[in-house]
């Protein structure tokens, strides 16, 4: 499902949604990803030593599995099913149940626009998974990490990742909620004013964090030591939550991997979002109904999911992003952060050195990036006037248009916007910035003839962080150097989650971000990155950001795959 592979980049219009969908289909075909649900941790659930474990939540008891590898509780409801009269409403409390609820199987993924024949998807999807270390509850509660998956706000689920090793090795509780996708998570219409209009998905994430606050102590976690972390669309989501008043106090730290919400395209003004909603309601046959909201809520879920968005979003035209100017995001995130109206918590933030190569590689399966016509056509989909960009990257394009395209996505969509976000945050709270770099990063897609080297592509750090299969990768086969690096990377993340500082004995010092250069994280080297801004041409992209009119650009994003 490629959920975490295609993320959004806020600073640049990369792919129109029809092309984005084709890329996801290609990726899914190459990975056979539809049936894979690594987060169900079958090796743990079906282990010979697995025993039932019952935990009491505020809605009822749940029965998970405990064994030598860890403890897991899957498919736990954190909100009522958002169906029927609850569609396009803020999440409501999960109904209580009697007896003990089975929690050994994950719930379905939230209904995406592109389903590729997937069977385990549903509009009724607001469940979460809890991964805990083995053994009894500790004397002191454990730090909690809440994972927000990627997928361009259109795809993905909490079972795309096996988070059990992270929980066990770092001695933390990891919680992975689902959240509504696409139209169900971001639809806006004048008939739906209030109740989370245009940002239901962000309220789902907040509801999961409130569930953590109420219930995580029963699983051995510390409700007041919570770190949200996510990649691609997950990082965008966390960036939104930094600017969302309703999320205040729900987390104490944040980790953003390959996602920055500073560009104007990261959210859509209410007027524009509602215009798109009116057009979509017309297409669905509801605009002339006496009760537009009731009509929209009565439609079959598949019909709603399949309808063309009729608006702009993170991936360009006919895509989705949260609405600003409403209850959830009163201000665009960039303005909220500039005005210091954001959560001032410690942040760990970064990107991968070759983010754009994954997108260029996927486009190579359906297009001809090395032809001038194909290259220029793609750039015109990314930017209303690409002439300055083509001129700035003419030296790279003269050698390889494929490389130029990949660099444009990396630099303008990820590296430089993320650096700007770090600059905006670091004067008020600790910021630790990184650039992940690994020329031999494990790769889960089928290698076709004439494949280009992918290097540290988008989402390639995840196999090191989780050290378990995820939707784009099987069981990692690390070299000794890669295994040592994976342990160090995970130790940085775990220490930050526990204390707000990634540093500790036995690993290189990670200085606070000074507004300029991040720390290089690589199996071969952990150290300063003095040439980051120059290599990614950030002077150019920072100037473009100040010149770009609102909502004139967008890009691919996120996925987890997340």
PLM regions: where:
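Methionine residue identity
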Residues: 1-2, 14
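Bacterial N-terminal signal peptides that target proteins for export
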Residues: 8-21
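Bacterial N-terminal signal peptides
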Residues: 21-31
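Non-catalytic accessory segments of hydrolases
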Residues: 33-199, 316, 372, 469-489, ...
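Serine-hydrolase-like catalytic core of hydrolytic proteins
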Residues: 37, 111-289, 293-294, 309-310, ...
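Extracellular structured ligand-interaction cores
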Residues: 59, 123-127, 143, 171, ...
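Short, solvent-exposed turn/loop segments enriched in Gly/Ser/Thr/Pro and often Arg
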Residues: 180-182, 229-233, 435-442, 508-514
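Substrate-gating cap/lid region and adjacent catalytic-acid/histidine neighborhood
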Residues: 261-262, 298-481, 492
């Amino acid at each position: 499902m490629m959920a975490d592979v295609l993320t959004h980049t806020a600073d640049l219009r990369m792919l129109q949604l029809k092309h984005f969908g084709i890329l996801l289909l290609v990726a899914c075909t190459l990975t056979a990803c539809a049936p894979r649900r690594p987060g169900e941790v079958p090796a743990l659930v079906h282990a010979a030593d697995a025993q039932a474990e019952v935990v009491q939540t505020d809605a009822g008891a749940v029965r998970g599995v405990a064994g030598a590898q860890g403890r897991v509780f899957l498919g736990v409801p954190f909100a009522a099913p958002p169906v029927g009269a609850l569609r396009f409403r803020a999440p409501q409390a999960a109904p209580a149940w009697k007896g003990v609820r089975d929690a050994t199987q994950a719930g379905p993924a939230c209904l995406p626009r592109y389903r590729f024949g997937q069977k385990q998807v549903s509009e009724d999807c607001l469940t979460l998974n809890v991964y805990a270390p083995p053994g009894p509850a500790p004397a002191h509660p454990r730090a909690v990490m809440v994972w927000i998956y990627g997928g361009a706000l259109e795809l993905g689920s909490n079972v795309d990742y096996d988070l059990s090793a992270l929980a066990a090795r770092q001695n933390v509780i990891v919680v992975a909620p689902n959240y509504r996708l696409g139209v169900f998570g971001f639809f806006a219409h004048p008939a739906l004013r209030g109740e989370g209009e245009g940002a239901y998905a962000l309220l789902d994430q907040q509801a999961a964090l409130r569930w953590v606050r109420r219930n995580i102590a029963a699983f051995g976690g510390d409700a007041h030591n919570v770190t949200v972390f996510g990649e691609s669309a997950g990082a965008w989501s966390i960036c939104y939550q930094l600017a969302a008043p309703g999320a205040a106090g729900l987390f104490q730290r944040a980790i953003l991997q390959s996602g920055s919400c500073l560009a104007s395209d990261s959210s859509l003004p209410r007027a524009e979002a509602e215009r798109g909603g009116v057009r979509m309601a017309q297409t669905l046959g509801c605009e002339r109904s006496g009760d537009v909201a009731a009509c929209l809520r009565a439609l079959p879920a598949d019909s709603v999911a399949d309808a063309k968005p009729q608006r702009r979003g993170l991936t360009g035209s006919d895509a989705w992003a949260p609405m600003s100017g409403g209850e959830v995001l009163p201000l665009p995130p960039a303005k909220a952060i500039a005005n210091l109206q954001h959560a001032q918590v410690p942040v760990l933030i970064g990107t991968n050195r070759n983010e754009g190569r994954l997108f260029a590689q996927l486009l190579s399966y359906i297009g001809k990036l090395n032809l001038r016509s194909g290259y220029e056509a793609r750039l015109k989909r990314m930017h209303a006037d690409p002439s300055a960009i083509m001129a700035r990257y003419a030296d790279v394009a003269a050698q390889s248009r494929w490389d130029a395209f990949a660099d444009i996505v990396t630099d303008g969509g990820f590296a430089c916007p993320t650096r700007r976000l770090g600059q905006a945050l670091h004067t008020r709270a600790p910021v630790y910035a990184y650039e992940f770099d690994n020329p031999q990063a494990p790769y889960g897609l089928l290698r076709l003839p004439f494949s280009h080297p992918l290097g540290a592509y988008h989402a390639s750090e995840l196999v090191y962080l989780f050290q378990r299969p995820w939707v784009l990768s099987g069981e990692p086969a690390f070299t000794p150097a890669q295994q040592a690096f994976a342990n160090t990377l995970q130790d940085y993340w775990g220490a930050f989650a526990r204390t707000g500082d990634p540093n500790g004995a036995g690993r290189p010092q990670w200085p606070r971000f000074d507004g300029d250069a991040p720390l290089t994280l690589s199996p071969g080297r952990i150290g300063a990155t003095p040439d980051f801004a120059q290599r990614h041409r950030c002077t150019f992209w920072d100037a473009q950001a100040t010149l770009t009119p609102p909502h004139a650009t967008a890009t691919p994003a996120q996925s987890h795959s997340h």
